[in-house]
Amino acid sequence: MKKVEAIIREEKLRPVIEGLEEDGYFGLTITEVSGRGRQKGLTLQGRAGEYKVDLLPKVKVEVVVMDNDVAQIINTIARFSRTGEIGDGKIFIIPVEDAVRIRTGEVGENTI
C-alpha cells in the first residue's frame, strides 16, 4: 500500500475530487495547509506599494491505495490540478506498512 499526498491549489480541490471519484477512488483526507516552494512566497502590489506573502494557502489531499493504483492516482491528481504556472504543487508517494479499520479491527489491504 502507498499513501499519495498531493499539495495543490485550493481552487483545484473540487476538480481533483471529481476526477478521483470518476476513476472510482472515494476515500480521501483533505487538510488546509500553508506553504511555499522555491519562489519563497510571492510579491503583490497594493495601494501602499509592494508587499510579500511568505506562505500561500494550499490544500493537502491524501489517498491510501494499492501499489498498482499509484500511477493512476498521480495521473488524475496532476491532470486536474495542473495550470502550468509556478505554485501548482507537489505529489509525494509514501509507503504504508499496514492499516487498521477502527470500527471492526480489520487489518490490511481490505481496509482501503
Each model region followed by its residue ranges:
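Positively charged, small/polar-rich N-terminal and surface patches that mediate targeting and assembly
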Residues: M1-I112
